[in-house]
């Protein structure tokens, strides 16, 4: 087991009723007719009043909620969705659950799962949402994975989009749960059948297998063909051109993107994603000025882009001073963006742009972690591992670093290897250190490779066998989507398809 006290399990997983009236049988026919009209009018008035109390005529409320969601006004959307959801409208229940999922708060996501499940009996959209949510659920059970497969297949048969990529993710994440399914063969069948999502499922497989760079030509071909119907392809094509250094093709793509955004065919979130590709040093030569222009264009309509702008200025200080950086962060925090809390906590943690303040760093990082920001767990773990708050707190460090590592942050594995190797606040545990040093080799650095070599020399054959068992256990706990699960394509696959028919059409 992996713990500062030898008790921490590595592979265990992360933790109206219409009023009735009666007529006298002795009433004359003319009076009966008049009475009937009165009762009908009263009944209609009562029904209208009930609907008004619920939120102002059902259909306009649903439309208002949908429009508010597109604007990012989740408070208004939630009020209107709830009014209709309380009346039993399944599509409004779906909208309400979508808002809960978007918070990334574990308790809210749990409520969303229950809401989707309640609506799934009558709503194919709810089936698709629930299936996607179960695919993304940490430490899902075998029963939940099988349920996700069933739901996504049912939703696909009923015409719901954005179902095949989550299915592909399910098969790639948990091959042991679906031993009869070969992901590549399944994708080949989908492509042969002409399913429009199948090409993107193939792209996801390349990302997952770490062979994306070897298939840039096919990725380009797939996404060029799907660009008009699947706007996530703007991100994939931008990535391809960035990796190849094809400035002319990138400029042409950005022109298409701007035109599509101007006519409302592409959401602001997609523009934000492309801007982040342009500013990603790991993809090749950056174009941070164009990235800033794109983000400034969409930030008023997409509050998350204020944080993207802050991150851009942080990464490229020549684009703005500290006042500009903090102004962007403040706008992000005003919009309750967890990434803003993460970046502010990181600034206090590093002590470069702002004076170092471990207490403030902990406060903001904790807020970000509670909202689902995986990187916040990494920095919290380092705070506790290094004793920045006054004392080394090894168990807190293990908890947060393990959460970060299992969430896909590779640097957390190296930090865990250091923790168990150095033994600050705990006795050294070279077997545990070896496990995480091995896991850190998914994206090796000279430092992690050197540490692994040192640990290799320290372990006895028995210790090596025990450590290998723990390593296998931890790998099973994490699944096999280490390289692909955090890609934009994968994340989008688990979220709502913005091109789906608005919910009021189903009411």
Regions found by a protein language model. Name each.
Residues 53-55:
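C-terminal motif of bacterial Sec signal peptides marking the signal peptidase cleavage site
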Residues 57-59:
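Bacterial signal peptide processing site
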Residues 63-114, 125, 162, 166, ...:
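Post-signal-peptide N-terminal segment of Sec-exported extracytoplasmic proteins
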Residues 72-76, 104-115, 140-151, 175-186, ...:
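Structural signature of tandem alpha-helical TPR/SEL1-like repeats
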Residues 87-89, 103, 121-124, 137-138, ...:
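Short helix-capping/linker turns of helical repeat alpha-solenoids
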Residues 95-102, 131-137, 167-173, 204-208, ...:
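Hydrophobic face of amphipathic alpha-helices that form TPR/SEL1-like repeat modules
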Residues 346-350, 366, 370-409:
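Alpha-helical adaptor scaffolds
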């Amino acid at each position: 087991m992996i713990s500062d006290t030898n008790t921490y399990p590595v592979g265990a997983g992360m933790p109206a009723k219409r009023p009735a009236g009666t007529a006298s049988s002795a009433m004359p026919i003319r009076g009966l007719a008049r009475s009937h009209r009165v009762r009908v009018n009263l009944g209609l008035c009562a029904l209208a009043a009930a609907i008004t109390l619920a939120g102002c005529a059902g259909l306009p409320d649903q439309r208002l909620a949908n429009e508010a969601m597109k604007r990012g006004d989740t408070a208004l959307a939630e009020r209107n969705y709830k009014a209709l959801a309380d009346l039993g409208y399944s599509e409004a229940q779906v909208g309400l659950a979508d808002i809960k999922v978007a918070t990334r708060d574990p308790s809210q996501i749990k409520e969303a799962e229950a809401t989707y499940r309640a609506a799934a009996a009558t709503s194919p959209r709810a089936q698709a949402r629930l299936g996607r949510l179960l695919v993304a659920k940490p430490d899902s059970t075998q029963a939940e994975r099988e349920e996700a497969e069933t739901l996504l297949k049912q939703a696909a048969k009923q015409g719901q989009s954005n179902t095949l990529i989550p299915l592909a993710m399910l098969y790639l994440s948990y091959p042991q749960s679906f031993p009869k399914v070969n992901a590549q063969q399944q994708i080949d069948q989908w492509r042969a059948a002409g399913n429009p999502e199948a090409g993107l499922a193939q792209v996801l497989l390349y990302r997952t297998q770490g062979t994306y760079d070897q298939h840039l030509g096919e990725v380009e071909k797939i996404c060029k063909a799907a660009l008009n119907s699947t706007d996530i392809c703007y991100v994939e094509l931008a990535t391809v051109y960035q990796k190849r250094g094809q400035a002319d093709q990138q400029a042409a793509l950005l022109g298409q993107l701007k035109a599509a955004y101007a006519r409302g065919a592409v959401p602001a979130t997609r523009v934000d994603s492309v801007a982040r590709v342009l500013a990603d040093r790991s993809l090749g030569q950056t174009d941070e000025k164009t990235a800033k222009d794109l983000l400034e264009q969409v930030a008023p309509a997409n509050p998350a882009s204020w944080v993207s702008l802050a991150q851009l200025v942080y990464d490229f200080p020549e684009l703005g001073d500290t006042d500009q950086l903090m102004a962007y962060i403040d706008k992000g925090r005003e919009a309750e963006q967890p990434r803003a809390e993460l970046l502010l906590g990181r600034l206090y943690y590093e002590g470069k742009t702002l004076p170092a303040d471990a207490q403030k760093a902990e406060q903001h990082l904790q807020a970000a972690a509670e909202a689902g920001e995986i990187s916040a767990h990494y920095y919290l773990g380092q705070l506790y591992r290094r004793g920045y708050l006054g004392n080394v707190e090894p168990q807190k460090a293990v908890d947060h670093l393990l959460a970060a590592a299992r969430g896909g942050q590779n640097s957390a594995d190296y930090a865990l290897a250091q923790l168990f190797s150095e033994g600050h606040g705990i006795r050294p545990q070279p077997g545990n250190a070896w496990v995480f040093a091995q896991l850190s080799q998914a994206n090796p650095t000279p430092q992690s490779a050197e540490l692994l070599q040192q640990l290799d020399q320290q372990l006895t054959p028995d210790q090596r066998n025990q450590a290998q068992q723990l390593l296998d256990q931890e790998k099973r706990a994490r699944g096999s989507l280490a390289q692909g699960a955090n890609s934009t394509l994968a994340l989008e696959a688990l979220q709502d398809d913005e091109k789906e028919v608005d919910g009021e059409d189903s009411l």
